[in-house]
Amino acid sequence: MKHRIGRVEGEILRELTKILRKDIRDPRLNDVTITAVECTNDLSYATVYYSMLTDDPAKEKEVAEGLDKAKGMMRHLLGQTLTVYKVPELIFKRDTSVAYGSKIDKLINQVKKQDQERENKNK
């Protein structure tokens, strides 16, 4: 059963990415990337994780509203392509791992820069 769930999650991820790029015309969703999908064991719910290019809270709220508005259309279009009896209910959650990774990368670069400055002063 786990193999089937993983296959359906991959199929939903692939199809939602296509739908978001080709069929949804909401300008609020231009910078959104679907990063992962997790389905419940009975495939009744699918948690869709997304990331954005910005960390602006106002933009984040706009994107959440845009995804909520487009949820019905996305589910309908998914139903036309998925090979499951019932299309899962979509739940959108922000994937903060990309932003967290970017923040860690900036901190590492700052430390490297400070180390270089200290080395140059000691010479």
Swiss-Prot record:
Q: Where in the cell is it found?
A: Cytoplasm
GO cellular component term, pick one? cytosol
- SUPFAM superfamilies recorded: Ribosome-binding factor A, RbfA (SSF89919)
Highest taxon of the source?
Bacteria
Give GO BP annotations, semicolon-separated. maturation of SSU-rRNA
The reply to whether Cytoplasm figures as a keyword in the UniProt entry is yes
Q: Name one GO molecular function term.
A: ribosomal small subunit binding
Coarsely, its chief localization is cytoplasm
Where does the signal peptide begin and end? none
Instruction: Enumerate the Gene3D superfamilies for this protein.
Output: 3.30.300.20
Sorted UniProt keywords: Cytoplasm, Ribosome biogenesis
This molecule's function is given as: One of several proteins that assist in the late maturation steps of the functional core of the 30S ribosomal subunit. Associates with free 30S ribosomal subunits (but not with 30S subunits that are part of 70S ribosomes or polysomes). Required for efficient processing of 16S rRNA. May interact with the 5'-terminal helix region of 16S rRNA.
Q: How does it assemble?
A: Monomer. Binds 30S ribosomal subunits, but not 50S ribosomal subunits or 70S ribosomes.
Q: Which family does the similarity line name?
A: Belongs to the RbfA family.
Q: What name appears for this protein in its UniProt entry?
A: Ribosome-binding factor A
Provenance organism:
Lactobacillus johnsonii (strain CNCM I-12250 / La1 / NCC 533)
